[in-house]
Regions:
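Residues at the starts of beta-strands that form the adenosine-phosphate
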Residues: 2, 26, 46, 104
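NAD(P)H-binding glycine-rich loop region in Rossmannoid oxidoreductase-like domains
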Residues: 31-96
């Protein structure tokens, strides 16, 4: 399968992309910079241009694959309502791109949704 992994240079996304590649899938990693593209190429992945901060940029890449695994987020641990809205919009755009194709969109989440915890 040809699979797009968003967040493929991050902790979870890199592990997912690596495992999919090891299983023989063609993995495309979302890249918003030259440095990220180089990191993806070094890992044996194909970089594809897109940015969660610009959800419309994700439509075309999502139409070119058999599945999407979304592990990216522009929100940080202390995300803002705006960053969470961009994340939501990005996933929605990819979902719309897949439409009624029957191709899966797998959405993951991170611990940031729980906010910042301190010991005590």
């Amino acid at each position: 399968m040809k699979i797009l992994v968003t967040g493929a240079t991050g902790f979870i996304g890199a592990a997912v992309a690596r495992r999919l590649s090891q299983q023989g899938h063609e993995v495309l990693g979302l890249s918003r910079s030259g440095a990220a593209a180089a990191k993806l190429r070094a890992a044996g992945l194909t970089p594809i241009v897109g940015d969660f901060a610009n959800p419309a940029s994700l439509f075309e890449p999502a139409t070119q694959v058999d599945a999407v695994v979304s592990t990216a987020s522009i929100g940080q641990v202390e995300g803002t309502p705006e960053s969470f809205a961009k994340d939501r919009d990005a996933v929605q755009v990819m979902s719309e791109a897949l439409g009624d194709s029957g191709k899966p969109l797998i959405f993951t989440s991170g611990s940031a949704i729980f906010g910042v915890f301190t010991k005590g």
